[in-house]
Amino acid sequence: MAVQISKKRKFVADGIFKAELNEFLTRELAEDGYSGVEVRVTPTRTEIIILATRTQNVLGEKGRRIRELTAVVQKRFGFPEGSVELYAEKVATRGLCAIAQAESLRYKLLGGLAVRRACYGVLRFIMESGAKGCEVVVSGKLRGQRAKSMKFVDGLMIHSGDPVNYYVDTAVRHVLLRQGVLGIKVKIMLPWDPSGKIGPKKPLPDHVSIVEPKDEIVPTTPISEQKAAKPDQPQPPAMPQPVATA
């Protein structure tokens, strides 16, 4: 007999499942450019789509790794046999994915690249990918014992209002270096895209689109038009004048 749970509890349970799944995949697929996960529930099975920049590494040799991940997810979350399927999907535009860029910056810093040089490299790549703006903040023991933060900004960035929810992609990562832990925060402002592929379909509220005027057809030969004469309008009857009384 199926146990009935309230809508509130179901939303909470779904949120916990997605958060735990995201944390597990972030740890497991960090080196493969993991960029997020989508969960689609159908009446017969649950489909989990893993978004990554290097999908071949996620799949593994002859699909071995994806089968191992499927078995782990099935066992950990108590799915019945064969009711869960994992798919790997390539991120369309790597430069517009904040998680992918935060991971890229993390590995650059782990490789010993200078903070300023690594951040400017990421900033340039994001802007070349077609972003409207971006912001990279690195904080921690950058030089010496005193902690400080460095902010690198380019282009346009909105910070308030409802459009932030669908125009700004944000990611936070931590990297452990010899001098301590550094925090990385990447914010990317996506461009407006009417097709909805690389950015939101809905334009910004202050966006003004100017319609191009239609081209007028210039007559090449002189023409004359005979306009019909207006019919005579009937005159309104004269108002009777008041008669003065003695």
From Swiss-Prot:
<keyword id="KW-0687">Ribonucleoprotein</keyword>
<dbReference type="GO" id="GO:0003723">
    <property type="term" value="F:RNA binding"/>
</dbReference>
<dbReference type="GO" id="GO:0003677">
    <property type="term" value="F:DNA binding"/>
</dbReference>
<keyword id="KW-0131">Cell cycle</keyword>
<dbReference type="InterPro" id="IPR001351">
    <property type="entry name" value="Ribosomal_uS3_C"/>
</dbReference>
<dbReference type="GO" id="GO:0005819">
    <property type="term" value="C:spindle"/>
</dbReference>
<keyword id="KW-0496">Mitochondrion</keyword>
<dbReference type="InterPro" id="IPR005703">
    <property type="entry name" value="Ribosomal_uS3_euk/arc"/>
</dbReference>
<keyword id="KW-0238">DNA-binding</keyword>
<dbReference type="GO" id="GO:0006281">
    <property type="term" value="P:DNA repair"/>
</dbReference>
<keyword id="KW-0206">Cytoskeleton</keyword>
<dbReference type="InterPro" id="IPR015946">
    <property type="entry name" value="KH_dom-like_a/b"/>
</dbReference>
<keyword id="KW-0805">Transcription regulation</keyword>
<dbReference type="GO" id="GO:0006417">
    <property type="term" value="P:regulation of translation"/>
</dbReference>
<keyword id="KW-0963">Cytoplasm</keyword>
<keyword id="KW-0472">Membrane</keyword>
<keyword id="KW-0227">DNA damage</keyword>
<keyword id="KW-0999">Mitochondrion inner membrane</keyword>
<protein>
    <recommendedName>
        <fullName>Small ribosomal subunit protein uS3A</fullName>
        <ecNumber>4.2.99.18</ecNumber>
    </recommendedName>
</protein>
<comment type="function">
    <text>Component of the small ribosomal subunit. The ribosome is a large ribonucleoprotein complex responsible for the synthesis of proteins in the cell. Has endonuclease activity and plays a role in repair of damaged DNA. Also involved in other processes including regulation of transcription, translation of its cognate mRNA, spindle formation and chromosome movement during mitosis, and apoptosis.</text>
</comment>
<keyword id="KW-0498">Mitosis</keyword>
<dbReference type="InterPro" id="IPR004044">
    <property type="entry name" value="KH_dom_type_2"/>
</dbReference>
<dbReference type="Pfam" id="PF07650">
    <property type="entry name" value="KH_2"/>
</dbReference>
<dbReference type="GO" id="GO:2001235">
    <property type="term" value="P:positive regulation of apoptotic signaling pathway"/>
</dbReference>
<dbReference type="GO" id="GO:0051301">
    <property type="term" value="P:cell division"/>
</dbReference>
<dbReference type="InterPro" id="IPR009019">
    <property type="entry name" value="KH_sf_prok-type"/>
</dbReference>
<dbReference type="GO" id="GO:0005743">
    <property type="term" value="C:mitochondrial inner membrane"/>
</dbReference>
<comment type="similarity">
    <text>Belongs to the universal ribosomal protein uS3 family.</text>
</comment>
<dbReference type="GO" id="GO:0003735">
    <property type="term" value="F:structural constituent of ribosome"/>
</dbReference>
<dbReference type="GO" id="GO:0022627">
    <property type="term" value="C:cytosolic small ribosomal subunit"/>
</dbReference>
<keyword id="KW-0694">RNA-binding</keyword>
<feature type="domain" description="KH type-2">
    <location>
        <begin position="21"/>
        <end position="92"/>
    </location>
</feature>
<keyword id="KW-0132">Cell division</keyword>
<dbReference type="Pfam" id="PF00189">
    <property type="entry name" value="Ribosomal_S3_C"/>
</dbReference>
<dbReference type="GO" id="GO:0005634">
    <property type="term" value="C:nucleus"/>
</dbReference>
<keyword id="KW-0456">Lyase</keyword>
<dbReference type="InterPro" id="IPR036419">
    <property type="entry name" value="Ribosomal_S3_C_sf"/>
</dbReference>
<keyword id="KW-0539">Nucleus</keyword>
<dbReference type="GO" id="GO:0005730">
    <property type="term" value="C:nucleolus"/>
</dbReference>
<dbReference type="GO" id="GO:0140078">
    <property type="term" value="F:class I DNA-(apurinic or apyrimidinic site) endonuclease activity"/>
</dbReference>
<keyword id="KW-0804">Transcription</keyword>
<keyword id="KW-0234">DNA repair</keyword>
